[in-house]
């Protein structure tokens, strides 16, 4: 099917339309709920895992039969770091496939008008061209450390495409870059680089440490997008995009790990020294998504990295430190 873009596919003018946000308690889902409420949507359906286990097909069927949402945003997923992916591969591929298959099929069967499936930049090959275009999908081998999760997410994209091709159903997919913001994971053992840096600098500041040492040289380039920008992009795509191909969602702005660390250090107010352990690995030299397709649709990010870090640190102080 041909792609359709622009105002002619604008579909979310009814602010009372019922919208099911799957995974509303996570980093992504909670931001999407905030954005929808901010834009005046009043009929959001939100279910905790205890209320609705998305891996149970019969329960998901029953939910859609009773609630009959008009739109679905699928932000629910089993996520984790390298250690978790290596230790529980069956969980990462199995649980995510179950969630996706159950929600996508039930949404179609029960007349959902449109579904947005959210994936991850890890769907792309380990040695993808930089910046990574949507067309890089399935062109080479994945990063082995998270291939179980990545394969499940690729299957989600392909499931949406299959329902569009066979049934003409409006299911679309968005692939976010590295995200950060309120409700991020700040756990010392399994958080990603940005929240990990924020926690380390904060604890060093509180404890009066003289130095924070970061792994590597600080030279790798990374891209970060504030989760509120992602949420804005999701609502934009749900409203304005209808196409077979998935859409990259990124900031388009690169920063070295060294620059990021300096910025986090400044935002947190740590006045000690920043050191680098160059005996430790740097990881991939560059990872940037090509988000020109999304830009051509008329969407651009609004939150600068500095402002986003300040907002995230404020949230961290109020919600993590005070627990």
UniProtKB/Swiss-Prot annotation:
Q: Which InterPro entries match?
A: Epimerase_deHydtase (IPR001509), GDP_fucose/colitose_synth (IPR028614), NAD(P)-bd_dom_sf (IPR036291)
Please give the biological process terms from Gene Ontology that the record holds. Answer: 'de novo' GDP-L-fucose biosynthetic process; L-fucose biosynthetic process
State the SUPFAM superfamilies in the record.
Answer: NAD(P)-binding Rossmann-fold domains (SSF51735)
User: Which residues are involved in binding NADP(+)?
Assistant: 23-29, 153, 176-179, 192
MF terms from GO for this chain are: GDP-L-fucose synthase activity; isomerase activity
Q: Which reaction does it catalyse?
A: GDP-beta-L-fucose + NADP(+) = GDP-4-dehydro-alpha-D-rhamnose + NADPH + H(+)
- The residues that hold substrate are 200, 215, 222, 282
- Which residue positions does N-acetylalanine occur at? 2
Q: How does it assemble?
A: Binds and stabilizes MUR1. Homodimer.
Q: What is this protein called?
A: GDP-L-fucose synthase 1
